[in-house]
A protein has these predicted regions:
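Start-of-domain marker
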Residues: 1-39
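Short, surface-exposed linear segments at secondary-structure transitions and domain or protein termini
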Residues: 8-16, 107-112, 174-177
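Short, solvent-exposed, Trp/other aromatic-anchored flexible loops in extracytoplasmic proteins
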Residues: 13-18, 25, 119-160
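Ordered hydrophobic segments in well-structured contexts
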Residues: 17-23, 35, 81-87, 112-114, ...
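Surface-exposed beta-loop interaction hotspot
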Residues: 30-87
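A structural detector for beta-sheet-dominated domains
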Residues: 70, 102-104, 116-118, 137, ...
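Short helix-loop boundary/capping segments
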Residues: 70-125
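Short beta-strand elements
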Residues: 161-177
């Protein structure tokens, strides 16, 4: 497929770099070229990963509530972002929640990430899921300083079954966006 979608002439987000999820279909233009048609599109909450100086002390202030990372559609690392599909228990869908990705850089583990979640007391009830994306510019800086183009990210989080972790292969983004 080449070029912009057939039903969109400019980004609905302006020049802002965002992660989005879309429902699309393929169609042919008048010359027989395959194009896409966007049925719907929604932006994904996007944040910078946070680099902390004193991670042991500071992690608690970012939250230690439990959530699940969905191992499937939506959980991916690409283009300088870690996008996560998550699920957690809640009673009030409109209650404030904070999710942050902490870069816990050390000599031993230069690419360790900790997902910190603060449910602000609303951590029981029905499960609901969502998406969040984190820009990995701190990881990019560390990897480039170490002369790496590809690294293995080590993500840790608190799950309902206890502490969990997983690994992601990541191709370092080589710009400073």
């Amino acid at each position: 497929m080449q070029g912009p979608p057939s039903n969109l002439t400019k980004s609905p987000y302006g020049n802002k770099e965002v992660r989005a999820i879309a429902n699309i279909k393929e169609e042919k233009d008048a010359k027989g070229k395959t194009k896409i048609y966007i049925n719907w599109m929604d932006s994904i909450r996007t944040k910078q990963a946070i680099a902390l100086k004193n991670t042991e002390m500071d992690l608690k202030k970012y939250g230690e509530d439990r959530l699940e990372i969905v191992n499937g559609f939506g959980t991916v690392v690409e283009d300088g972002y870690l996008t996560l599909r998550y699920s957690t228990a809640m009673r009030d869908l409109k209650a404030k929640r904070d999710i942050n990705l902490i870069v816990q850089h050390s000599e031993k583990e230069p690419y360790k990430l900790v997902l910190a979640y603060n449910a602000h007391g609303d951590n029981k009830g029905r499960f609901a899921s969502g998406f969040i994306a984190f820009r990995l510019s701190e990881i990019d800086k560390i990897a480039q300083k170490n002369g790496k183009k590809d690294v293995t990210l080590h993500l840790h989080w608190k799950s309902y079954q206890g502490d969990k972790h997983t690994f992601f292969k990541y191709h370092v983004r080589n710009d400073s966006k």
